[in-house]
């Protein structure tokens, strides 16, 4: 073999395009179901089927894939289940927009044809995101990939719905929901974005019914007064206590409504009197229930005023009605004042339209109703059980503080609205008779049988609504494993080991998976929830299209030109006026576009930033640093191969050194340097194992980086060169063996984080290191399924670690002396040394090579060294004195030092004057003052050194 077997430079795309498909083809991700091995499994949070990969996905999947590869290499039965979500609203909107561009609405097509179009779109674009997941190096078991609307998943959804209905835990009722008047559907809280906006606070006079005066009512939404059923004051508000129980006339409507008292009122807000509109406000709805006030709806589903309002406003859009109502109140002298007011406005995240609380007929899951007999937890509600399993420690959150958030959400829970007025999704399995009869069944045939059993023989019409996307997502922990059937996968992989997720969906997804899984299987869905932060830009800003700061992970992997990047960031903006600003910012930030960093560099960056619970401020400069790391690892491997291929690397004898085999005169003569790097590797292996156990990927990445770059490459390779050049055959053999074995171990250690480069290098290193599976030709085996390194405490060698620390200190001291004396790297000079003669003699060949010296001369004592030093700088390291012997022009050196000392003294005077100025210290930012103090300390330190050098110069 020659060194040409490894390409001269690291080309990530070549390796990724080879090994990604190869791993998948070989089926390494399909688990053995070996009862003697531990099980490890993870669910991939299913991304939207027609979506594209974003930085949050890349981060999340780096963590998951790292865990999966680690446990697979530990020999566990390892399953990572991939899948995609049908994403009801998101997908329907995309297809509706395509139709809009053709001048066609979904209603023109009809439901059946429209759903066909969505399926066509899913088939065309659905592989985009799974292709991108593959590009990030993710290694789930693709043979088990699911789509939340495929036949098996749909069967599970219907089964759950029917069983919950039969158990009395699903019901249909009229409740207040978030309503999007453009999409004409209920939406979940997660699809509502509330941001502070500038609005107004109107003070309106409501005349007392007996004509004795009026109450001034404060509101931010005057149009909803048409649906007022009461006005409300705080029961302890002395200003209004005497009016409770009386009535006011509702302006413009001329009906009388009561004055009620409720603790909900904030006495400090406005006038302390507020209107009660149960049909169009969530808080008012609860007030209405407490006081038995019937709600009055005044809006149509598309947010126009309906026939319950006075004729003058019927048919008006809600905001046009607001203006007309305010104008009429003003004309009647009932508008007391209008004041600017900041308020939180809820908008649909898909449409940007103001969301309207709306009373509609919907399907709900009962959150607090006790489950009946025959279930896993009779007498307890699904919420109660979900709280209990976390309190008992069956599920733990990492970091632990998210447990509190989970409790708070569940302790204040409302019944879950699960119906959506869409066409794309799981159609609700309910059929209606002509007189309002409801038959919930697994299919229409069962529904007809139910109807017949109850004596109904008329027509049946299926419910048009579909289920909330989160309903099917909540079943994934068991539906993806084959439920309702009992499968081997259910036995091995439920509960899964860990869920890796962002904090934003703890309630919407995490809590609901706990509810559904405990209710239908009696088990928790996962043992641990690892909650990570969100990926933000380098300044800590949220990444968003409107800010123009989004990054596509695939662009970081493959690179993208500036013009293409600008086009990507400026097309499809909600507000096209932002395009110019975004273009300017992008051209400034990426003048040459984004270079190709490769998947491994991106993954290493993500892992290095994965501190517990904190948001990740993604910085491309870090990515460049980890690409440089990959290059360093590649070049180190080339060096090792060049120095080991074709040589005796010490693998002709058994692994374990027998008596006399490993030492002077033995088959292998390991040096202290060899033993040091092996000892240090045990510590790194232990640190990495702890990092995986604690989900501290930042610690894992840092341990790998520091060991490879700082210890193996910067120190051990340089020491190994000396040993190969100067050593005996036994020493050379031991060094080559150590070079290979440590490198091969490093490749296995780093594989879960940087899978592609480690696989490519392992193919070359493992055969030489005696670690390639027997009987396999190069390329036939894979690093992906090799054993993960485990620390061996017996290989720790503190004496050799101390030896290395002392050697490094001597080398560093020599390098510092070179710097002090302004020696160019090409200039080789002798080192004079005195002190521990035996140690200095042992260090000599290493120090000579690493500090670029012509020789190392060990003198008998310090007196001899001082006599030979001729005033040159002396370094003291432990009990050793070191000096570089450089012939210098004493007069010229004295002049140079004197000039530099004078300059430094001048700088010190300036610094002292600045720091002695009270105004500067008081007004300057602390960082500026600290910087000045640091400069002063550096000047003083250098002055002391130069003074000592000057004093040592001969007269």
From Swiss-Prot:
GO terms for molecular function: aminoacyl-tRNA deacylase activity; ATP binding; valine-tRNA ligase activity. InterPro entries: aa-tRNA-synth_I_CS, aa-tRNA-synth_Ia, Anticodon_Ia_Val, M/V/L/I-tRNA-synth_anticd-bd, Rossmann-like_a/b/a_fold, tRNA-bd_arm, tRNAsynth_Ia_anticodon-bd, Val-tRNA_synth_C_sf. ATP binds at residue 545. One of its GO terms (cellular component) is cytosol. CDD domains: Anticodon_Ia_Val, ValRS_core. A motif ('KMSKS' region) lies at residues 542-546. Its EC number is 6.1.1.9. It catalyses: tRNA(Val) + L-valine + ATP = L-valyl-tRNA(Val) + AMP + diphosphate. GO terms for biological process: valyl-tRNA aminoacylation. A motif ('HIGH' region) lies at residues 47-57. Residues 887-953 form a coiled coil. It holds the Pfam family Val_tRNA-synt_C. It is an enzyme of class 6 (ligase). Keywords: Aminoacyl-tRNA synthetase, ATP-binding, Coiled coil, Cytoplasm, Ligase, Nucleotide-binding, Protein biosynthesis. It is found in: Cytoplasm. It comes from the Bacteria. Belongs to the class-I aminoacyl-tRNA synthetase family. ValS type 1 subfamily. Catalyzes the attachment of valine to tRNA(Val). As ValRS can inadvertently accommodate and process structurally similar amino acids such as threonine, to avoid such errors, it has a 'posttransfer' editing activity that hydrolyzes mischarged Thr-tRNA(Val) in a tRNA-dependent manner. NCBIfam families: PRK05729.1, valS. Monomer. ValRS has two distinct active sites: one for aminoacylation and one for editing. The misactivated threonine is translocated from the active site to the editing site. This is Valine--tRNA ligase. It comes from Burkholderia pseudomallei (strain K96243). The lineage of its organism: Bacteria, Pseudomonadati, Pseudomonadota, Betaproteobacteria, Burkholderiales.
């Amino acid at each position: 073999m020659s060194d040409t077997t490894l390409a001269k430079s690291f080309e990530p795309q070549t390796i990724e395009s080879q090994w990604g498909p190869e791993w998948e083809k070989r089926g390494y991700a399909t688990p053995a179901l070996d009862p003697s091995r531990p099980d490890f499994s993870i669910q991939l949070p299913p991304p939207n089927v027609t979506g594209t990969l974003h930085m949050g996905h890349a981060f999340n999947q780096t963590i998951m894939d790292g865990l999966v590869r680690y446990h697979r290499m530990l020999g566990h039965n390892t399953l990572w289940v991939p899948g995609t979500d049908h994403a009801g609203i998101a997908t329907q909107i995309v297809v509706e927009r395509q139709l809009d561009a053709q001048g066609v609405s979904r209603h023109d097509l009809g439901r059946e044809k429209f759903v066909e179009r969505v399926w066509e779109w899913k088939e065309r674009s659905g592989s985009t995101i799974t292709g991108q997941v593959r590009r990030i190096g993710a290694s789930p078991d693709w043979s088990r990939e699911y789509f939340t609307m495929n036949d098996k998943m749909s069967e599970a959804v219907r089964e759950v719905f029917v069983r919950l209905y039969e158990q009395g835990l699903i019901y249909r009722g009229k409740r207040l929901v978030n309503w999007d008047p453009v999409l004409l559907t209920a939406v979940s809280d997660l699809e509502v974005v509330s941001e502070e906006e500038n609005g107004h606070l109107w003070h309106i006079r409501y005349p007392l019914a007996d004509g004795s005066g009026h109450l001034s009512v404060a509101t931010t939404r005057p149009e909803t007064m048409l649906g007022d059923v009461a006005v409300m004051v705080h029961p302890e508000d002395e200003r209004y206590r005497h009016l409770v129980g009386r009535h006011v006339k509702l302006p413009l409507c001329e009906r009388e409504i009561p004055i009620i008292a409720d603790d909900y009122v904030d006495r400090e807000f406005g006038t302390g009197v507020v209107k009660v509109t149960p049909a169009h406000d969530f808080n008012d709805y609860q007030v209405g229930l407490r006081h038995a006030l019937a709600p009055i709806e005044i809006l149509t589903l598309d947010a126009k005023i309906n026939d319950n309002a006075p004729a003058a406003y019927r048919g008006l859009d809600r905001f046009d009605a607001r203006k007309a109502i305010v104008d009429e109140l003003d004309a009647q002298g009932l508008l007391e004042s209008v004041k600017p007011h900041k308020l939180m406005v809820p908008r649909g995240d898909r449409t940007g339209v103001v969301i309207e609380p709306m009373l509609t007929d919907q399907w709900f899951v009962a959150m607090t109703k006790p489950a009946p007999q025959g279930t896993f937890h009779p007498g307890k509600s699904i919420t109660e059980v979900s709280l209990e399993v976390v309190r008992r420690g069956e599920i733990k959150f990492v970091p632990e503080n998210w447990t509190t958030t989970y409790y708070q959400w569940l302790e204040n829970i409302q019944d879950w609205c699960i119906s959506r007025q869409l066409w794309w999704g799981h159609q609700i399995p309910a059929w209606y008779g002509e007189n309002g009869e409801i038959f919930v069944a697994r299919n229409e045939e069962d529904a007809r049988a139910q109807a017949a059993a109850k004596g109904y023989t008329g027509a049946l019409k299926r419910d048009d609504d579909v289920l909330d996307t989160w309903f099917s997502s909540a079943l994934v922990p068991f539906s993806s494993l084959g439920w309702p059937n009992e499968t081997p996968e259910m036995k091995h992989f439920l509960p899964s080991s860990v869920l890796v997720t962002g904090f934003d969906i703890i309630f919407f997804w995490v809590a609901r998976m706990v509810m559904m899984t405990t209710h239908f299987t009696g088990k928790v869905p996962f043992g641990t929830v690892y909650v990570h932060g969100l990926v933000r830009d380098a300044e800590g800003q949220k990444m968003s299209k409107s800010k123009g700061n989004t990054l596509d992970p695939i662009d970081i992997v493959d690179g993208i030109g500036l013009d293409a990047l600008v086009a990507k960031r400026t097309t499809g903006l909600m507000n096209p006026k932002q395009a110019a600003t975004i273009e300017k910012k992008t051209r400034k930030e990426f003048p040459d576009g984004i270079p190709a960093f490769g998947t491994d560099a991106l993954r290493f960056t993500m892992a290095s930033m994965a501190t517990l619970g904190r948001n990740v401020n993604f910085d491309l400069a870090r990515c460049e640093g980890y690409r440089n790391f990959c290059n360093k690892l590649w070049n180190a491997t080339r060096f090792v191969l060049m120095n080991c291929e074709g040589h005796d690397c010490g693998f002709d004898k058994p692994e374990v050194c027998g008596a006399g085999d490993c030492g002077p005169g033995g088959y292998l003569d390991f040096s202290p340097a060899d033993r040091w790097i092996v000892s240090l590797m045990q510590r790194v292996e232990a640190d990495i194992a702890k990092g995986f156990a604690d989900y501290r990927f930042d610690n894992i990445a840092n341990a790998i980086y520091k060991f490879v770059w700082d210890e193996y490459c910067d120190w051990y390779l340089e020491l190994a060169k000396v040993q190969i050049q100067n050593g005996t055959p036994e020493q050379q053999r031991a060094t080559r063996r150590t070079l290979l074995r440590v490198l091969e171990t490093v490749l296995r250690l780093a594989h879960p984080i940087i899978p592609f480069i480690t696989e490519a290098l392992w193919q070359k290193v493992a055969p030489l290191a005696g670690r390639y599976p027997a009987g396999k030709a190069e390329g036939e085996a894979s690093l992906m399924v090799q054993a993960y390194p485990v620390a061996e405490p017996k290989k720790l060698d503190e004496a050799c670690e101390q030896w290395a620390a002392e050697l490094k200190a001597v080398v560093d001291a020599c390098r510092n002396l070179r710097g002090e004396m302004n020696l160019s790297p090409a200039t080789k000079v002798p080192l004079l040394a005195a002190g521990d003669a035996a140690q200095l003699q042992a260090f000599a060949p290493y120090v000579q090579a690493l500090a670029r010296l012509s020789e190392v001369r060990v003198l008998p004592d310090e007196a001899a060294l001082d006599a030979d030093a001729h005033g040159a700088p002396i370094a003291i390291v432990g009990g050793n004195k070191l000096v570089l012997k450089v012939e210098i022009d004493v007069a010229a050196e004295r002049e140079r030092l004197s000039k530099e000392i004078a300059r430094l003294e001048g700088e010190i005077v300036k610094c002292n004057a600045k720091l002695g100025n009270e105004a500067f210290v008081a007004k300057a930012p602390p960082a500026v003052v600290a910087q000045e103090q640091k400069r002063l300390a550096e000047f003083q330190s250098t002055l002391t050194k130069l003074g000592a050098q000057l004093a040592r110069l001969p007269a």
